[in-house]
Amino acid sequence: MRAQNNLTVEVDCHSLGSNECPSMTSSFSPMDSPTPTPTSIYSQGSLASPGWQDAGSYPGHAYERHTGTTPMRSAFRLAGMTSNENMAMSYGAMEAQERMPMPDFLSAYDDNVEHFWLPSDAPKTYETGTHSLPYPHTLPQCPPMVRSNYRPHAAYLPEAATNPCLSRSIFHHAERVPQSMSMGNMMPWIPQASESIAPQTIAPSQVGPVTPPPSYSEFPTSIQTFKTHSPTTPLRSCSIGTASGPDTPISRMSGGAADYLEDFQQSPPFRDGLNRLQRHPSRKMIRKQSSRQNMSLENLPSIIKQVQFKCKEPGCKGRFKRQEHLKRHMKSHSKEKPHVCWVPGCERAFSRSDNLNAHYTKTHSKRGGRNRYVATLDESSPDYDPDFRGQLTPDGRPIRGSTLDDPMPDTREYSVDGLDD
């Protein structure tokens, strides 16, 4: 295969005389070229040299060289390669001694290099043709990513993942690279290797209007204006805002929280919710307003007129919803009070039984009052017996076996000590 792929050299000597372009049969060395070559680029310190000049002569490849005093550009052409052959060689099919290690070709690229390799006998430049790519003669814009405080055992991302110049193979065709990824748009934003990035404090007065980069021209036309402001903190910032349109992530970034809050308050969902709250006040507010209105006599509701059961007693304004409630109320106006307190010495009468039971609970079941204490009506007493009807001791304890018709017992006969015996 090597015997078939011979290399020839074609030199454009239109501007030179016949005596200035003599033919030569000596082998070509990239170090002798007056113009920048890949080897001379590596010798400038940008990238590690792959050792092309140390390889000596190349077997199977014949080079022709034309020399002259005037600097000229040499072009090489791979003559023996047909149009249907692929330029890339299978990495697994190459011999071990022909595989070029990636750390020798690119500095700081020492891991995961299986996907990026160069054959040792690959040509240095190409002509513009079917299998051609204009090789950059100088690479001052793409310095290597310098690692400070290099630690050989520390894990880090390969340079191809961080350096945009190494994200694509250098042998890819130019038409495969999109316009947004071209070197012209990328180079002005890549810092030079000689520049040292140091933390700086920028005063608000030093922050001027920020102009968009060239790549922003490819953004949609919805971005019409670029807002700039002077931050209060020593940080450089810019914001991209939209003059109008729906809520987008870009509009959220514009102007900080204040501008976004204004846009949010003007959004249709916010306005609809605010109008809904204004149209439908809460129930608590309605209750408060109605209670304030009901406090005045002029705004009393007409519920009393709907009550049909009224008290017929002169001077009584009692009104009830049910008939039985009216009957119970009428007993309070009558002279009849059939429900009498059985406690000796009280004998208070009530027209209703529920009033009598309330009298027992509130009056005779508590100690220390002016009314007589009855132990049988106290739920916390051991003598509690609500059905007991009989005579009581002076301290309110029941006398078992006595009745209400019996005479009042003598206090000297029924003492507490005598009951305990």
UniProtKB/Swiss-Prot annotation:
A biological-process GO annotation: sporulation resulting in formation of a cellular spore
Annotated stretches, region: Disordered: 228-247, 361-421
Zn-finger region bounds: C2H2-type: 309-333, 339-364
This protein's UniProt keywords: Activator, Conidiation, DNA-binding, Metal-binding, Nucleus, Repeat, Sporulation, Transcription, Transcription regulation, Zinc, Zinc-finger
Expression induction or repression: Expression is down-regulated by dioctatin A (DotA), a metabolite of Streptomyces.
Organism domain of life: Eukaryota
SUPFAM superfamilies per the UniProt record, alphabetical: beta-beta-alpha zinc fingers (SSF57667)
PROSITE patterns linked to this entry: ZINC_FINGER_C2H2_1 (PS00028), ZINC_FINGER_C2H2_2 (PS50157)
Compositional bias per record (Basic residues), positions renumbered to this chain: 361-370
Biased composition (Polar residues): 228-242
One Pfam family named in its UniProt record: zf-C2H2
Chief site of localization: nucleus
GO cellular component, one term: transcription regulator complex
Compartments, record wording: Nucleus
MF-aspect GO terms: DNA-binding transcription factor activity, RNA polymerase II-specific; RNA polymerase II cis-regulatory region sequence-specific DNA binding; zinc ion binding
Function: BrlA, abaA and wetA are pivotal regulators of conidiophore development and conidium maturation. They act individually and together to regulate their own expression and that of numerous other sporulation-specific genes. Binds promoters of target genes at brlA response elements (BREs) containing the conserved sequence 5'-(C/A)(A/G)AGGG(G/A)-3'.
PANTHER family tied to this protein: TRANSCRIPTIONAL REPRESSOR PROTEIN YY, YY2 TRANSCRIPTION FACTOR
The protein's name: C2H2 type master regulator of conidiophore development brlA
